A protein has these predicted regions:
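Basic phosphate/pyrophosphate-binding loop/patch that engages nucleotide-derived ligands
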Residues: 96-104, 118-132, 227, 231
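Predominantly a Rossmann-like dinucleotide-binding segment in NAD(P)-dependent oxidoreductases
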Residues: 111-183, 187-190, 322
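N-terminal Rossmann-like dinucleotide-binding module
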Residues: 1-39
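A short helix->loop->beta-strand "cap" motif at the edges of active sites that frequently abuts
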Residues: 74-76, 101-103, 203
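Contiguous beta-strand/loop segments that form the cofactor/metal-binding neighborhood of enzyme cores
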Residues: 168-248, 282-296, 332-335
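Beta-loop-alpha module in the N-terminal Rossmann-like domain of NAD(P)-dependent dehydrogenases
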Residues: 40-97
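Hydrophobic residues in well-ordered beta-strands that form the structural core
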Residues: 57, 80, 105-107, 134, ...
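C-terminal helix-rich "cap/oligomerization" subdomain common to oxidoreductases
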Residues: 54-57, 103, 283, 287-335
Length: 335
């Protein structure tokens, strides 16, 4: 049994990590570092390290690097919530440290196991040459909530919050782009950090458009894929987050089931509805356990997460300079 120490018990720790850890039969939640009441609460990070084999970092973004570094130095396996770190140098240091310590290091890119993404991934080869991929994550939050994500600083803003998910999904399907163009804005009155982004990743004839808005009362399609053999469009977010917020046990048969179907349009104009694959976030922690106990590949390679950070850096540069950046421009950022 792998003893797990959970650092942070806010939205990520309480809603996502704890329920998924509890239903994985090879993991045991042994310690939780939080100011909230919890039966596994410990008084310090040091106490948590003493009781843990695997440390899950679900604290605010700027804490990810120092906490993950300390855990790896103490020969603990580490899961880091997204974003992996707030800069590339930190990501490089953690990856190198994990290699030296021969410890498992992975990043919680749970959206790889969204049912709608799995459906889009499955249908992709049937669309011929895909020429346009659009992914949207829209919300309607005209009022600014209090919290560290809304305060200027490294790791704040919607590009650091939702951007890693959309970018990671795109990289899983298409790999690194040849160029990027980005628009990143703070649109809400009184907003201190960005709450809107529009990224275009360029690949030969393919364009990948990743967009998020906080002022979208009527959301755009979650996915829209258009190719030489037809299109696939799916509305609505994967239900697992809302199910977890509602307290549903991830082991329940209805967990991850999305009744909203996608629409496949053929070359002849005929349409066909497609059932959405069942989402399965618990697969991430099953993969973590297999990596620790059996030497299996980690469910998310931290180098993949680093690639996403690189694109976020390039997106900010592109937006600030008002121009598209060829991917070789990343060389100065990657150091």
């Amino acid at each position: 049994m792998i003893r797990v120490g959970l650092v942070g018990y806010g939205l990520a720790g309480r809603t996502f990590h704890e329920p998924l850890i509890r239903v994985c039969d090879k993991l045991e939640l042994a310690a939780v570092l939080t100011s909230r009441d919890h039966p596994r609460r410990v008084g310090s990070f040091e106490d948590l390290l003493e009781r843990s084999d695997l440390v899950v970092i679900a604290s605010p973004n700027q804490s990810h690097f120092p906490q993950a570094k300390t855990a790896l130095e103490q020969c603990k396996h580490v899961v880091v919530d997204k974003p992996f770190t707030v800069c590339l140098d930190q990501a490089d240091e953690l990856i190198a440290l994990a290699d030296r310590q021969e410890r498992v290091l992975t990043v919680f890119h749970n959206r790889r196991w969204d049912g709608d993404f799995q459906t889009a991934k499955r249908i992709l080869p049937e669309l011929g040459e895909v020429l346009l991929y659009e992914a949207h994550w829209d919300r309607f939050r005209p009022s600014i909530k209090q919290g560290w994500r809304e305060v200027p600083g490294r790791g704040a803003g919607i590009l650091n919050d939702l951007g890693p998910h959309l970018i990671d999904q795109a990289l899983q399907l298409f790999g690194m782009p040849q160029a990027i163009a980005a628009d990143v804005l703070a649109q809400r009155e009184g907003a201190l950090v960005e709450d809107y982004f529009d990224l275009t990743l360029e690949y030969d004839r393919l364009r990948v458009c990743l967009r998020s808005s906080t002022l979208m009362a009527d959301p755009r399609p979650r996915f829209a894929l258009h190719g030489t053999e037809g299109s696939f469009v799916k509305f609505g977010l994967d239900p697992q987050e809302e199910q977890l917020k509602a307290g549903m046990d991830p082991s329940e048969p209805a967990f991850g089931v999305d009744l909203r179907q996608g629409m496949r349009t053929l070359r002849n104009g005929k349409t066909k509805t497609l059932p959405t694959e069942r989402g399965r976030y618990v697969a991430f922690y099953e993969g973590v356990a297999a990596a620790i106990l059996d030497g299996a590949p980690v469910p998310v390679d931290p180098r993949d997460a680093r690639a996403g950070l690189l694109l976020i850096d390039l997106a900010r540069r592109s937006a600030a300079e008002g121009r598209r950046l060829p991917f070789p421009a990343a060389s100065s950022t990657a150091k």
